[in-house]
Amino acid sequence: MSSALILVAGLITLPGVAAEKKTVTTNMKSNVQTDYMNGLLKLALSYSNKEYIYATTSEVYSRPRVMESVKSGSISVMWGGTSEEMERDFIPIRIDAYRGLMNHRLFFIRQGDQARFDRVKTFDDLKKIKFGQGRSWQDASILEGAGLQVVKATKKPSLYHMLDGGRFDAFPRGANEVWTELSAFPNLKLTVEKNLVLIYPLPTYFFVSPKDPELAKDIEFGLESAIKDGAFDRYFYNSPEVKEALGKADLKHRHAIRIANPYLPKATPLDRKELWLDLMGESPKSVSEPIAEAAQ
C-alpha cells in the first residue's frame, strides 16, 4: 500500500471525523400521534450530518410538565398547536406536521344523539352545544373566543367519561385522532358524529427547547428537504393514522362550520400552498374570516 493510501485510511478512522452524536429526548408515548410525530422527527433529522440518538422520559408527563421540561432543556422537543405564547417561549418549526388535517375537527358524541346534531346547520346552532376540552389546550381558548360553551378537564381521559356521563354534548378531535381514540374506549357509549366538521386553523408544530437552537435548525432543514424530495408526502400518506382518517372522515361531504383562531401567530405560513392539503376543495383560511360563517 502506498504512503498516500495509508494516510487516507488513517484519516478515515480518526475520531475527529466521526459523526457527532446527540441525544434527542421526547415525552413517553401516550397515543398513536406520538408514533407519527416521532417518526416524522426521525425523518427530518435523517437529513442532518449529526448522529442522533433518541430517548424518552421514564413516564408520560402532563402537558404543563412537558412545557417546563422543554424550557429547561431536559426534554429536547415537543409538539402541539401553535400560539403567540408557544412561539415566544419555544423555537417553533413552522411546518404543520399534519398539513392542515388537524384543523378539521370531528365530534365524539353519545350514541343516540345523532338526530340532535342532524339539526345543526349554522354557527348559531353550534352555540347551543356544550363542548368538552382540556383545561390547558389552545382549542379551549379558540372555542371560548368564538362564543361557544366549553366544559374543561385537566386530564384528557376524563373527557371521554364526562361526555359519556352527560357533562357536555360533544368532544371535538382532529380528523386523524377520532377513530383510534374511539377504539380505546370500547366500554363507553360514544360514537363519531356523521355529518359535521368544525374547522379552525391550528397548525401542529415541533417546538424545540430554547436551549438547543442547533436542533431546531436541523429539524427545519430536514422537513424542508423532505418536502422538496417527496419524502414528507410519502411518510404522511403511508401513515396508518392518516390513511384511516382520509378513508373514514369523508370531509368533502360533511357540512363545514368555520371559526376564527384569534391566537394564530401572524408568522403562520398560510401562503405556502405546498404545506397544506386542500381537504375541502378550498384554500387555507386566515383569522380574519367571520367566525359565524358556515360552508354551504
Question: How would you name each of these model-derived features?
Answer:
Residues 18-90, 219:
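Extracytoplasmic small-molecule ligand-binding "clamshell" domains
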Residues 60-76, 145, 157-176, 185:
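Short helices/loops that flank or line small-molecule/ion binding pockets
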Residues 69-71, 78-90, 171-193, 197:
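A ligand-binding cleft/hinge motif common to bilobed small-molecule-binding domains
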Residues 134-146, 223-294:
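Ligand-binding clefts/hinges and TM-proximal coupling segments of bilobed small-molecule sensing domains
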